[in-house]
Design a protein with these regions (language model features):
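Substrate-binding clefts and catalytic carboxylate motifs of secreted carbohydrate-active enzymes
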Residues: 1-102, 283-285
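Flexible loop/turn segments at secondary-structure boundaries
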Residues: 35-41, 116, 190, 209-212, ...
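Catalytic beta-strand/loop cores that center a nucleophilic Ser/Cys/Thr
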Residues: 209-211, 228-327, 344-362
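Short, exposed coil/turn segments at beta-strand boundaries within extracellular/luminal domains
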Residues: 158-164
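Low-complexity, Pro/Ser/Thr- and charge-rich linker/hinge segments at domain boundaries
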Residues: 165-186
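Beta-strand-rich binding/interaction modules
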Residues: 83-125, 132-140, 148-157
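Soluble or luminal CAZymes and related metallo-dependent hydrolases
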Residues: 3-11, 293-295, 328-332
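Short alpha-beta junction capping motif
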Residues: 179-228, 306-309, 315, 336-339
Length: 362
């Protein structure tokens, strides 16, 4: 629940901030703050059906983006390259009891270790309205040479509120990998021969190749399920984000938490789910896709194992097309390849090749 709840919180933050950035905005109304137990159960709330916290978002965090005074940023994108300059407009929505005179607005950009890359401040009168322009903030990204998650924070001291956003910066020039695996689109004779010889194989399953009963009929999307799939007659999406171990070495060059954030948006938008219920009961994919709570299948979009004398990585994300326009997909592929070229690539589970083949159309 924590991982799907964090995605739900991210989606609520995006919706509410979009409303607050809208000219002529006159207020917002959410469907509910708590889960609705009727009509097949709608798990739409950040509180449960008894109005109790679920444990994935606190009132304090929710207030950072849903409050009478909220700092806002108009990001053109959330994934950047290190040959770009981050330059984004900062604004404020203020609907307090009275205007704020000479409000002190501070901002900073920091990495995951807390090191500040840039900071600054503005002094601004805040009338009771929204779309109040404050100024542009940002910094050059050329000093970032490794895949990095940054946090952009803005605080209005007089309003006692601080909002923040995660962004990602990836290097334009990637590390050369000398020991590339054999890349295949099916577990054919050539791929099996290489595995039997002890080689590494990366199986990139093409979009649309997964059989319907093995996940091809599951509509994957970045956002969460609305209401429930039973009541909406399988309205897409059918999933609730990803769950992974951020410390897994396959993700070492793709900074992430254990749940979805915006660096996963492109990947989730161009992937197929794989149903892994026929795999061992205790088997866990590298990147788990959280299923609809009515079906609760074991879904994956990246998994690994041993076959014969070799090692196999299977991915159902599109990591081959338009990579020059898809920096997150390009970096995710790089992270997988670096892992497969290292001594850390040593899966503990032996897979049945027929169960792998059973996932996709022949």
């Amino acid at each position: 629940m924590f991982a799907s709840g964090r995605l739900q919180t991210l989606c609520y933050k995006a919706e509410i901030e979009a409303a607050l950035r809208t000219p002529g905005f006159a207020g917002l109304q959410l469907l509910d703050l708590h889960d609705f137990p009727g009509q097949g159960s709608a798990l739409v709330g950040v509180l449960d059906a008894f109005w109790e916290e679920k444990g994935y978002v606190s009132p304090e965090e929710y207030n950072t983006f849903c409050n009478q005074t909220v700092p806002l940023i108009r990001f053109p994108k959330m994934v950047w390259l290190n040959n770009e300059i981050l330059n984004v407009p900062l604004e404020v929505a203020h609907f307090g009891e009275r205007p704020l005179q000479k409000a002190n607005i501070t901002w900073n950009i920091s990495d995951q270790n807390g090191k500040k890359l840039a900071e600054g401040n503005f002094v601004k009168d805040l009338p009771v309205t929204n779309c109040i322009p404050v100024g542009n903030i940002g910094c050059a990204l050329s000093g970032i040479n490794q895949p990095t998650q940054l946090t952009v924070s803005v605080e209005i001291k007089e309003a006692n509120n601080k909002n923040r956003w995660n962004i990602w910066v990836y290097p334009v020039k990637q590390t050369t990998i000398e020991k590339l695996p054999y890349i295949a689109s099916s577990l054919d004779n050539q791929a099996m021969n290489r595995l039997n010889k002890g080689e590494n194989v990366l199986l990139l399953l093409q979009l649309g190749s997964i059989l319907p009963e093995k996940g091809g009929n599951i509509s994957v999307g970045f956002s969460s399920i609305f209401w429930n799939t039973a009541w909406t007659n399988k309205q897409p999406p059918h999933t609730l984000g990803i769950l992974c171990d951020p410390k897994h070495p396959a993700l070492a060059a793709f900074p992430t938490e254990r749940y979805s954030d915006y660096q996963w948006w492109d990947l989730m938008s161009r992937c197929n789910a794989m149903v892994l219920d026929d795999f061992p009961a205790d088997y866990r994919p590298v990147v788990h896709l959280i299923d609809d709570w009515f079906t609760n299948r074991k879904l994956g979009i990246l998994f690994e194992g041993k076959i014969g004398n070799g090692k196999l990585m299977v991915c159902s994300i599109d990591l081959q097309n338009d990579l020059d326009k898809r920096p997150a997909a390009r970096q995710f592929r790089q992270s997988i390849l670096q892992y497969m070229a290292s001594d850390q690539f040593n899966p503990s589970v032996t897979l049945d090749p027929e169960k792998v083949r059973a996932l996709y159309k022949k």
